[in-house]
Amino acid sequence: MVKELVERIRQKDQRAMSQFYQQYVDELSSVCYRYVPFEDDAKDVLQNSFVKIFTSLPTFDYRSEEALRGWMRRVVASEALLYLRERKRLLFVEQTAEVKELADADEPQADLISPDTLHQMISELSVGYRTVINLYVFEGYSHKQIADLLGITESTSASQLYFAKRILARRIKELTNSKR
């Protein structure tokens, strides 16, 4: 079914494009909002992503729907990062010895809260923390790949992830303690 849809898009079938868009817009929107939480900006990024997907689809080597979905998620993530870089919203905090370290906590206990609550907590992180945690945890990038993609050092990527996890662990702990 999906393979036939891709073939029809390659032949510039407008109905196939519309059907494809409807089939994947929700999934790709959620990827987009992880990086760009502002609705108007996210809509722009998503639109640019679909343009890129539709123009690149003729050369995409379709092997499976899973591979297609992974590729589209990477396109959206790349477009979101490009958008943030162009607008200088992607700020990273270099951690130094002078930075007051957060209390060392275990890994965030994400299983204690709902996925929606976790998503909300991640969206409230600073852009740098949020971007690195999304790329590392949800997209599976290594610190080297993140560093290359964002133009930062591997240690900055690792530091951003460390502090993002500490903040999330603290917030989860506060939330679960307040419910007792």
Sequence positions of predicted segments:
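Sigma70-family region 2
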Residues: 10-11, 50-65, 87-88
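N-terminal module of bacterial RNA polymerase sigma factors
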Residues: 1-27, 58, 123, 144-145, ...
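Helix-turn-helix DNA-binding module
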Residues: 123-131, 139-156
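Short helix-capping/turn signature of helix-turn-helix
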Residues: 22-26, 34-35, 134-141
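Internal acidic/polar
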Residues: 2, 82, 89-118
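Structural recognition of an alpha-helix C-terminal capping motif at a helix-to-coil junction
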Residues: 44-51, 66-78
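Short, charged helix-capping/linker segments at alpha-helix termini
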Residues: 10-19, 30-48, 154, 176-180
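Arg/Lys-rich amphipathic alpha helix in sigma70-family domain 2
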Residues: 59, 73-94, 163
